[in-house]
Each structure stands twice: as C-alpha cells, then as structure tokens.
Curated annotation (Swiss-Prot):
InterPro entries xref list: GDSL, SGNH_hydro_sf, SGNH_plant_lipase-like
Name the UniProt record assigns to this protein: GDSL esterase/lipase At1g31550
Record's GO cellular component terms: extracellular region; plant-type vacuole
Family: Belongs to the 'GDSL' lipolytic enzyme family.
Length: 394
C-alpha cells in the first residue's frame, strides 16, 4: 500500500511540474497586440527599399510594369505582381503596409518600418566577394541593423521610448540568407562549397536576433529558406536530362531542396538554443519551406494551375524563364491571370502565392510555435484600415 501511495504522489508531482511548465511557456507566448512591424531581409520582404536606393539611370526591374499590376496597379518596388507576405501579415494585424525606410518621402514609421533590401545577404558582401561571389550591393543583415540603430532617435526619440517600440513590435527577420547561397549557385559553385556557408549564415541571423533582444525585442518571426529546387531560375540553370534528379511529384530538383532542408534544420536548432537562453522572448519559426512546397505538391488544391513550375512573367524555355530577358524587360509580358501561378518572374512568387503563404503562417501550421491571436479577433473586426482589406477569416 505504501508503494502505491508513493507511486501516486510521484504521478501527482509529475503532473504538477508538467502543468507548471506549460503555464510558464503559455505565459511567454500569450497573445500580444502588436503596435508595429519592424522588418529586415531581402526581396521577399522589400516593399520598395531597393527602388528608393537606386539611381534613376539604373532602376531595378521591380520599377517597371508588369510589377505591381494586380493590386497596386503600378510598380511599387515589390518583386511581385502585388502584395508580399509582409503585406498580408500587416493586413491581418490591422496595420498599414510597412513603408520602406529608404526613399520614403515624409514617411510615417509609427506603425512600422522596413529595412529589407532586394539582393541583400546575411553575411557581409566583402566576405562573400573575397570568396569570389559577386554581390550587387552591401545591404547585409548587419548593415540593415546598423542603419536601424542609427535611425532610432528619429523613429522613437528617447531610449526608453525606443525600447517600448521595439518590445511592442513584431520583428520580421527576413527571409534572409538565400542570396548568400543564390550567388554561388548561380556561378555553378559546388554544393559542398556552398554548404560551408550555412553555419556562418545561421550564426549571423542568431547574432542579429540576440542584439535586438538586448534592445528590447520580445517577438520575432524568423523565416526559414524556400525549396530552392523548385525555383524556376535554378530549374532553368541546372536543367538536366537525368530524370532521377527531379522529384516525380513536384518536378523540383531534389539535391537543391535537400540543401534548403539543411539550412532550415540548422536554423531551427539555433532558434531552439536562443529560446532556452531567452525564455521571456517569443521566437517563432516561419516554415517557408513547407508552406511553399505544398503549393507544388497540390497546386490545384490551392487554386493554382498544375504547371506550377512555369513563371507567369517571362519568356522562353520549358519554364518560361530567360535570365537575359527577365520580367520587366521590354517585350516580356505577364500571363493573363497571375492568380493561377505560383511563380511570378522565375525568382519570386505571385501575390496569390504570398497570400497562401501568409495564411499558412497566421492560421498555422507553418508558424512554430503557432501565433495566439485570441486577444486580437474583436479588435481586428472593429478596426478600419484605409486602403487595406483583411482577407483572413476570424
């Protein structure tokens, strides 16, 4: 009888500790009413920074039609036909679209600020250039973070106010790091050589998060990489007659997708380490890899055509892509219905694909751990945002 009582007590003690642990974790991931979005990254989140930084004689392709045609009805500097993932997240939160920091005339950054620049890398461009990887500019993650810190007096004034602003913001960390791999892959560098960059990229992202935590950051959305083997550009560049290199279900290159998985796995391991070191901080992994891959596995389920590996805007070849005649060039037209396509220009996605990706993040299951929006539902229903339309069901 005594042994049974002891067993019961142990069970009760275990249950108490488990309940206590869940309560502690839940309290740290409880619903928060974000007052703004602070964004870093590359073209996946760039809402116009590269355009604002560019000389009028050397504008990016995103400055020309048909970019922006679907929603804004004119080019905005976004590398898509319309809105990006960050735009749909802003809509869901009832916030205005996050303005680019560069090139904004009388920009209002009270509800958000975006430092993401197309073609940006995680690692410093000088480091990559030394390895022989050409970078078009140096707006690495470190540079973006430095500019953010320099801008704080104008953004929020006093240090205490800035700490509050950062603490009440959803901080979007990318996607960043893809170009660190894209540039050498475009130069046909060996896989093992590119793989050596992964720990350096992960460490750089981790250091940036740690620095922002020290500045008061409490909630981070950290995207992983995309399935590079499904990129129209890489499918064109690495085209082969060996069908064993392709996934029979998606048509994507298996070896490149495995590389993307490796990056995402390493990033998740590092985020787990950061969570243990900072239990008061909510670090959410955005599974861009699987949120994107599902569109290739079952395109018709999500409203896309079965030829999901064909660019909407492009010309030539089996994937409607030619790097020397890219979208935005004279004579290169877009498809009649971009909403049926996953790929926009061979390197970036359509607005429809971005909406599906964002939907998978804010409503799960591609946010790990998932967001808790319980305190936002009534607010979002009541809030009116001029020029924005909320597409997510409550």
């Amino acid at each position: 009888m005594a042994s049974l009582d002891s067993h019961v007590l142990m069970k009760l003690g275990s249950l108490f500790l488990s309940t206590l642990f869940v309560s502690i974790v839940s309290s740290e991931s409880q619903c928060r009413n974000f007052e703004s979005i602070i964004s870093f990254g590359d073209s996946i989140a760039d809402t116009g920074n590269l355009l604002g930084l560019s000389d009028h004689n050397n504008l990016p392709m995103s400055a020309f039609p048909p970019y922006g045609e679907t929603f804004f009805h004119h080019p905005t500097g976004r590398f898509s036909d319309g809105r990006l993932i960050i735009d749909f997240i802003a809509e869901f939160l009832g916030l205005p679209y996050v303005p680019p920091y560069f090139g904004s005339t009388n920009g209002n950054f009270e509800k958000g600020v975006n430092f993401a620049v197309a073609s940006a890398t995680a690692l410093e461009s000088s480091f990559l250039e030394e390895k022989g990887y050409h970078c078009p500019h140096n707006f690495s993650l470190g540079v973006q973070l430095k500019i953010f810190k320099q801008s704080l007096p104008n953004l929020c004034g006093l240090p205490s106010d800035c700490r509050d602003m950062i603490g009440n913001a959803l901080i979007l960390m990318g996607e960043i790091g893809a170009n660190d791999y894209n540039f050498p892959f475009f130069q046909l560098r060996p896989l093992d050589e590119v793989k050596e960059l992964v720990p350096l990229v992960i460490s750089t992202i981790s250091s940036a998060i740690t620095e922002l935590i020290g500045m008061g950051g409490r909630t981070f959305l950290v995207p992983g990489g995309f399935p590079l083997g499904c990129s129209v550009a890489f499918l064109t560049l690495h085209q082969t007659s060996n069908m064993e290199e392709y996934d029979p279900l998606t048509g994507c290159l298996k070896w490149l997708n495995k590389f993307g998985e490796y990056h995402s796995e390493q990033l998740q391991e590092e985020l787990n380490r950061l969570r243990k070191l900072n239990p008061h901080v909510n670090i959410i992994y955005a599974d861009y890899y699987n949120a994107s891959l599902r569109l290739g596995r079952e395109p018709s389920k999500y409203g896309f055509i079965n030829r999901h590996l064909s660019a909407c805007c492009g010309v030539g070849g089996p994937y409607n892509f030619n790097l020397s005649r890219s979208c935005g060039s004279v004579g290169v037209e877009a498809c009649s219905d971009p909403s049926k396509y996953v790929a926009w220009d061979g390197l970036h996605m359509t607005e429809a694909a971005h909406k599906s990706m964002a939907d998978g993040l804010v409503k799960g299951p591609y946010a790990i751990p998932p967001f808790d929006w319980s305190c936002l539902s009534s607010m979002i229903k009541k809030k009116e945002v001029v020029g924005n339309t909320i597409f997510f069901d409550e």
